[in-house]
């Protein structure tokens, strides 16, 4: 009888999509703990996993933009780099709390998303991709030439926040702890993305992707959902930039070229434009 009730209560939990996300996060945290205490996996392997997770955060933004809204963007490199440089500048040059720099990145990302969203109402397809590419190239030139802000071609560095400053941990130990923060952020964003995509918001975006005329006939606002798709995409890119600088502690203009955007786009397409797991694997 006990086994029956246990199975009855546990089975729905195991089948819930969030369960897989949480288990995924716990496995990664366990790997970090093993690397920390037993030396296996090696720290280089954990850094590789962290890089994949950072790219995945940015890729999740494509789930909304390309997978559901059917909108193309090649501006991801610029948006991600801007997030990295902003948080790096605040950590390096100012005494403001880390959370303030995060809020600034999110605010700038929202503004960029709204701006590009309005542009998407006028142009679509390859023309929209070209416009976002142009915006990314403008940002790239800023990254290269605004030396006081970005360090110019030599790039900029910033000490890893939170643990190093608040708890007095060494750089190596702080980086390991930051990996756990990164995993928590990834799992949280997976849950948020899954919820939004399965909600009425996701269905409205999908209808807009399939036919803008039919979507408008059903009362779906193109303005609202295109703006939302781009805002979510740029916010995720900004968060990816935050994690990039916070974990790696260094960024240079060469990180934010067209190849960054193309590699991400390829990863999302190969893995599946509406698949979170596919984005990570891709």
Where are these regions (language model features)?
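Transmembrane alpha-helices and adjacent helix-loop boundaries
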Residues: 1-282
